[in-house]
Amino acid sequence: MSARRLPALVVAWVLAAAATAAAGDRFAVVITGASGGEVYAKKYTQVRTSFTATLRDTFGYKVDHLFVLAEQEEKNVQKATRENVQRVFVDLRKRMTKDDQLLVFLAGHGTLTDGSGEDAKFNLVGPDLSASEWADLLKVIPGRLVFVDTTGGSFPFLHKMAARGRVVLTATDSSAQQFETVFPEYFVRAFDDDAADTDKSGRVSIWEAFQYASAAVQQWFEQKGELPTERPLLDDTGAGVGREAQAPGVDGAIARVTYLEPEPALELPSDAALAGLVRRRAALEAALEELKARKESLSPDQYATELEAILTELARVSLQIKAKS
């Protein structure tokens, strides 16, 4: 794919993400796998319970839209087995639509499947699922996907899970990085810390959570006087390459307009077609503000291309609203 063509595709994906963001439901699958010991079990339990509380109590995820799996079965928590994971995604395939959003969050241990470093497993209770198998499970799920693998063996998941319009995060940028990670704690914390809301919009986007957690990981290693053994990556172009939070790159445009919490409520007209146009205009206006916020990180040509695309579509939608009003 040419460098010239890539920005145009990114613009299209951002517009699509922005346009559908307010329309659908939100689902989440939060999994902490086999712990391998009491210390790890305590850590993973804390991450899981904190994150599910945020999704449920702060963001308002419905009980039947939030699937939680862990090493030990308990109330509203299934055992994290291969069979239960597969069953969850069979259910989601039936229930979700193209306008819905799904978050998949993995915390625990990850291991490489062989010496090539091309594939890895997320450790479950009993038989595991490899990155390739996760990709097969999720490719039939409709809607938008945010996939976050916070394990030490997460890097191979980046290129296995990457696809057009998806947002994929991993805790590591190399198959050689297989140590226990601190990324999950900081990623979860981002959604409860006003400091993560760098654009002061009142909400934390996936990109802002990624930036927040990446900076916290770096600071954690600096304070310990150690070289980092994890460097988080984010991919949302589908290229499967990704970028670090402070590195240049095209990735991040969709993540900047992707949120876990529902979109703010709009006062919508009773006419369904007109209501859809009002939603799209609001989403485009949000995308425009996001683009302005990252102007300094873009080349003049790329900024102009994205700005023209958004303004052109915004003008078209505004004319349609005027004609129907």
Q: Can you say where each PLM-predicted feature lies in the sequence?
A:
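Alpha-helical, heptad-rich or low-complexity scaffold/stalk segments
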Residues: 150, 270-323
